[in-house]
Amino acid sequence: YRADMWKHFTAEMPELAKIPVVGTVGDKTFNAEQVVALNPDVIFIPVDLKDQYESDAKAKMDAAGIQTIYIDYHAEKLESHQKSIEAIGKALGKEERAAEISKFYTDRVTRVLDRVSKINKPKPTVYLEVGMNGPEEFGNSFSSNYSWGALATMAGADVITKDVIKKTSPINPEFILEKNPDIIMIMGS
């Protein structure tokens, strides 16, 4: 899925290449039997994939005694991030470290949101796209309440795809030309 990143990570840390590939829930390559064979104590699943995971694999995890914890980072809500950090810390026996991370993160987000709230000028219109497919193919854009779109909205942007995308999806190039956004951001993944 992110072969370019994997190539760089494994170049720096070759031992990563020894980690078994178990697939992903989102593209239905998740291999529950392989996960069970690895005998983990816990599995973390993005809350966005809860329905698919529960229909495809959760019963197998439950039968094997593997705890499932749902985490939520894509809605970009501070409270969801705090709860996810806390749940991960608790599951790993690192509650103190999780509390430190949550406090650091909360302080930084609060600082940015406070500054944004003091800006008194029109919001720039913004188009966001994950351009990991290269220039030949349009990547996913985001609604104003999901992932990069939610972050841009919190930072004071008016995301042009807010009314046409529910979460994330490629957008018709004509739409972008028609909206003529003030800012176009093409990001990596």
Predicted regions and their residues:
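Structural recognition of the beta-strand scaffold that forms the well-ordered cores
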Residues: Y1, V42-P46, T68-I71, P124-V130, ...
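A short, structured surface patch at a secondary-structure boundary
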Residues: Y1-A37, V42-K50
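Short coil/turn segments
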Residues: R2, V47-K50, Y73-E76, S144-N145
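Alpha-helical, coiled-coil/dimerization segments enriched in small aliphatic residues
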Residues: G26, N140-K167
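Alpha-helical segments flanking ligand/cofactor-binding loops in enzyme cores
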Residues: E33-V36, A59, E174
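Residue-level detector of structured alpha->beta connecting loops
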Residues: N39, G65, G156, N180-P181
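Extracytoplasmic substrate-binding proteins
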Residues: Y53, A57-E136, D158-T161, P170
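Ligand-binding pocket segment of bilobal, Venus flytrap-like solute-binding proteins
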Residues: W148-L151, T168-S189
